[in-house]
Design a protein with these regions (language model features):
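Transmembrane beta-strands of outer-membrane beta-barrel pores
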Residues: 1, 17-19, 38-42, 112-118, ...
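Transmembrane beta-strands of outer-membrane beta-barrel proteins
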Residues: 30-34, 95, 106-108, 162-164, ...
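Solvent-exposed loop/turn elements at secondary-structure boundaries
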Residues: 24-88, 105-142, 179
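C-terminal beta-signal and terminal closure region of outer-membrane beta-barrel proteins
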Residues: 56, 60-63, 139-144, 190-221, ...
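Residues on the lipid-exposed face of transmembrane beta-strands in outer-membrane beta-barrel proteins
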Residues: 11-15, 95-99, 110, 149-153, ...
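Outer-membrane beta-barrel signature, preferentially recognizing the C-terminal barrel domain
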Residues: 62-107, 135-157, 205-213, 267-272, ...
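Conserved small-residue
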Residues: 50, 137, 154-266, 387, ...
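Extracytoplasmic gating/loop element in the C-terminal half of outer-membrane beta-barrel translocons
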Residues: 221, 238, 243, 294-389
Length: 419
């Protein structure tokens, strides 16, 4: 109540400087405009009644702790209500330039943006003793800032018409506030395999949904490596170490490999995204091509943990496992008694996922010239197209451009499924 409506103002202004007297006599710039805007938007893409709680009917009763305390049919709140939840508001500043040069053959568009998302709507982690699911809260603030640009050229040589466009985006994402004491929200567990900790995290000062786990220093190649892998007190980190095991890094040098040694492993958010559009036409024959690319992001290959299990099938990458000194420094030995190598979340699952993809190619022919005397047909064409023709990447998974994650704010988990 009292939060069913919102007020979200916006302002914009522009200056077409090529219409000024001091620009009238130039012959190299056809159009130029400086612009700026500021505005707010409220997020309405949310479920209804998130401030309240539905009632769940449990015909078989429910568990609370180790004992089944309620054995008869019952009804419980599905989640903890939050009557104070309110709008998620995005506040954005844009400063840009639009320009065309050389009789409008060359075009340029440039934008700087600074966007602050306030009162981020997120499911709040709660203790199991709450007896119901997590409520939605206004959990924090997230900042996105960067630049966007587009550069295009069009030209004509006799009957040959051609054009090219290049666009790019550089974005920096940072969580600036979280509405809990720790300033941290951990993602879902059991993502890589049953019993594993969360792989994604939200933390103040870091990009949203970054990957979190243990750093490694390769594999123990021989018994000398095993004997040398000791704590500061000179004791083995694990009693059952063997050649082919992962060498986890003790970040704080406390003699233990645990959650205190976990650090940022990477981010599923790219540093730079680009797009290229090419087109050409000659006497009715035309061709178009679209390329897209992303750079500076990482992917967590979750399917590896399932593949490295005796009860599941294997991928061909298992042939690159450690099976003797020098055979691998990334994929550990196969083992049944100890699952530490694959169950501890570490950078052995992390991969750079830079790529450039030919996303679309079209080849066609226009019959406009042949049909110019047919009054009841304005135009016709025949064409063939190919989508996702080829991806240039060093990533060895199925698809580097994965968006899956079990949490709405996370991404970049590769399940090894068909794209």
């Amino acid at each position: 109540k009292g939060k069913r409506w919102g007020y979200f103002p916006s302002f914009s202004a522009g200056w077409i400087f090529t219409e000024e007297d001091f620009m009238k006599d130039n012959d190299w710039i056809s159009f130029g405009k400086l612009r700026a805007s500021w505005g707010q938007n409220g997020n309405q893409s949310i479920s209804n009644f998130i401030y309240s709680s539905n009632i769940s009917y449990l015909p078989q009763g429910y568990y609370f702790g180790p004992d089944k305390l309620v054995t008869s049919p019952t009804a419980i709140p599905a989640n903890v209500p939050n009557p104070d939840v309110t709008w998620e508001t995005s506040e954005q500043l844009n400063i840009g330039l639009d320009a065309r040069f050389f009789k409008s053959n060359l075009g340029l568009s440039f934008d700087y943006y600074n966007k602050m998302t306030k009162d981020w709507l997120v499911l709040a982690p709660i203790l199991g003793t709450a007896g119901a699911g997590a409520p939605y809260i206004n959990g924090g603030d997230i900042k996105n800032s960067g630049i966007e640009f587009t550069l295009n050229w069009k030209g004509k040589v006799s009957d040959f018409i051609y054009g090219a466009s290049f666009s790019g985006t550089m974005n920096r994402n940072e969580v600036t506030r979280l509405a809990n004491a720790e300033g941290i929200i951990n993602g879902s567990s059991d993502v890589l395999s049953q019993g594993t900790a969360s792989i994604s995290r939200v933390e103040v000062g870091f990009p949203i949904g970054f990957f979190y786990g243990l750093k490694t220093d390769g594999l123990l190649q021989n018994q000398d490596d095993v004997d040398a892998y000791l704590t500061p007190e000179g004791k083995p980190y694990f009693e059952d170490l063997r050649p082919g095991d992962v060498k986890f890094i003790d970040q704080n040098l406390d003699g233990l490999i645990n959650d205190d040694d976990k650090v940022m492993l990477g981010s599923p958010l790219p540093d730079f995204e680009m797009g290229i559009q090419l087109n050409a036409e000659y006497k009715g024959v035309y061709a178009n091509a679209t390329l897209v690319g992303k750079f500076g992001m990482q992917v967590m290959q979750s399917y590896r943990s399932f593949a490295d299990n005796f009860t599941q099938n294997y991928t061909t990458q298992i042939f690159g496992r450690w099976h003797g000194e020098g055979t691998s420094n990334r994929i550990p030995r196969l083992g049944y008694a100890s699952t530490r190598n694959i169950n501890l979340i570490s950078d052995i699952y992390m991969h750079d996922a830079d790529f450039v993809r030919i996303s679309n190619v079209v080849l066609g022919y226009r019959f406009n010239e042949l049909l110019r005397n047919v009054k009841w047909i304005k135009g016709a064409s025949v064409y063939t197209s190919v989508n996702n023709l080829y991806t240039f990447t060093r990533y060895d998974g199925m698809d580097p451009d994965v968006g899956y994650a079990p949490d709405s704010w996370a991404s970049g988990v590769d399940l090894g499924l068909y794209p």
